[in-house]
């Protein structure tokens, strides 16, 4: 148990273009070394490219892509006796969103395209179409949870 008190969650300011907290969270995840202006440029260019390619609204593309990435269940380690079991559990909404954004940026960075703008745009399009690395990761997490269903009664 933590010895210190509860740390309150910080409020996230909505971004200036789409007035969305979700966009700010994605930009913050893209940001490296505090370079927020660069992260914003990367995100806005990528979302414009992706929405132009799909012929949809930018926010529709982002929300659709994240919906296809966010996991519903995951496994968590639980020690019972001398054994450690992977217990499948439902994912809280805040964590679902956080994991979705994390995987989106992580798999965009791992892609082979030349610039981060192209990588992120391609990953957004892939995620929107239910393909790509981030969606594979979600499916893998779901498979793990399905495989460990017999241990579901160890929930806490």
UniProtKB/Swiss-Prot annotation:
**Pfam families for this protein:** Ribosomal_S7
Q: Which domain of life is it from?
A: Bacteria
- Transmembrane stretches in the record are none
Any one Gene Ontology BP term: translation
Record's keyword annotation contains Ribosomal protein = yes
* The entry's keywords: Ribonucleoprotein, Ribosomal protein, RNA-binding, rRNA-binding, tRNA-binding
The task this protein performs is described as:
One of the primary rRNA binding proteins, it binds directly to 16S rRNA where it nucleates assembly of the head domain of the 30S subunit. Is located at the subunit interface close to the decoding center, probably blocks exit of the E-site tRNA.
Name of the protein in its database record: Small ribosomal subunit protein uS7
Give the species: Symbiobacterium thermophilum (strain DSM 24528 / JCM 14929 / IAM 14863 / T)
């Amino acid at each position: 148990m933590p010895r210190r008190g509860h740390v309150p969650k910080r409020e996230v300011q909505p971004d200036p273009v789409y007035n969305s907290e979700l966009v700010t969270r994605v930009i913050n995840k893209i940001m490296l070394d505090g370079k927020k202006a660069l992260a914003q440029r990367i995100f806005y260019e990528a979302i414009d490219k992706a929405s132009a390619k799909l012929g949809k609204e930018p926010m529709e593309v982002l929300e659709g892509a994240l919906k296809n990435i966010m996991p519903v269940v995951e496994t968590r380690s639980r020690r019972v006796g001398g054994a450690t079991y992977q217990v499948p559990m439902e994912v809280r909404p805040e964590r679902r969103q956080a994991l979705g954004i994390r995987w989106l940026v992580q798999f965009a960075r791992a892609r082979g395209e030349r610039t981060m703008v192209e990588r992120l745009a391609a990953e957004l399009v892939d995620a929107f179409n239910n393909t790509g690395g981030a969606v594979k990761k979600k499916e893998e997490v779901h498979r793990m949870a399905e495989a460990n269903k017999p241990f579901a009664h160890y929930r806490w």
